[in-house]
């Protein structure tokens, strides 16, 4: 963050500063977690569903907070200088929106039902070859995370990529009002957060708020092979760039091939190789390339940048655990992302490859559509000739029903109520050379399957070592 004064902060938030504070005191760091606060930082006491930052005011002051931003109801709780605001959450949004107005950087807003974080990181890599920029922290994509990510920027940065999440109509509009993006990207549209959105039409309405927020001088990038997204383009008051494989896209990929080595394709005569697992990442990469091309980045530089792309753990990351090839896609799951992940399995061509195994936890937040969506995944797994399906959770039976109804042998399907049962099934079923896709919603914590696989592989290696020592 650029160095500002308490006067700037007070004016941006319309707060009241206590007499103990000095208006010209410089500030350049905001902290919302008292445990990581550095001396001289502003402590912003936020409220969440399971915490209240006001409970940690004494700790923040003890660690050297220069000023604490507090709600009016807690004005007397801090022993040191305070900035009193009506609501600390709203004040953070107001401050970030004000700060956005001081920046010259190109702000890129990104949303979508799936693929947001991967697309965000690809955009950053694509532009970083020629420009200095930053992206949202981790999965900071709500009314707390986006402002904090925006406040990370300073005068050195020429672009900012901000991820925008949504669970209901109005969420994206609220975030866009803070960020004032000049470029908008929607990575995909599908049934995610149906429990709160209520319907696919509401998801379309909500995600499209990003397009409506763009200035006429900006531009949008949309996957043009998706008819829903094509129809949404009319909501943008600025030019729209369509990307995809079809002939009528403004930026078109040819010679597309997904393999164990990664995703290869050609754009405008330039060959790309992105080290990601799965053809579905093509759209993510094309969105990044389109933005880079539009702002004048050399495509050869973009190709070199994307060749160094590193997927985040839990997001289609290919790993070798013992004798198995594992696709770690454990970060989250929705019908769209699970279907895309399942389609990765047939693409993997490895020497001595064994069976293809799907280990799936529940897809959460689907509301009344949950049973049907889980059955569809079972049907898809059968149609893709996946060899073994192990489903875990409240909707495991629906996945199993779908797979069996679509022709999969019942002896190749397991519906497990819990993780311990999953481990027991895999312990019996797995063979050397198997390719295992592990996926599930965040709440299911399917990374525990990877931890178990790692431990099992370690024990097998140790046992082989003991056997060799004994035989010798």
Predicted regions and their residues:
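Active-site regions of enzymes building and remodeling cell-envelope glycoconjugates
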Residues: 78-87, 237-242, 410-413
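Acidic-glycine-rich active-site phosphate/pyrophosphate-binding loop
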Residues: 119-124, 252-271, 314-319
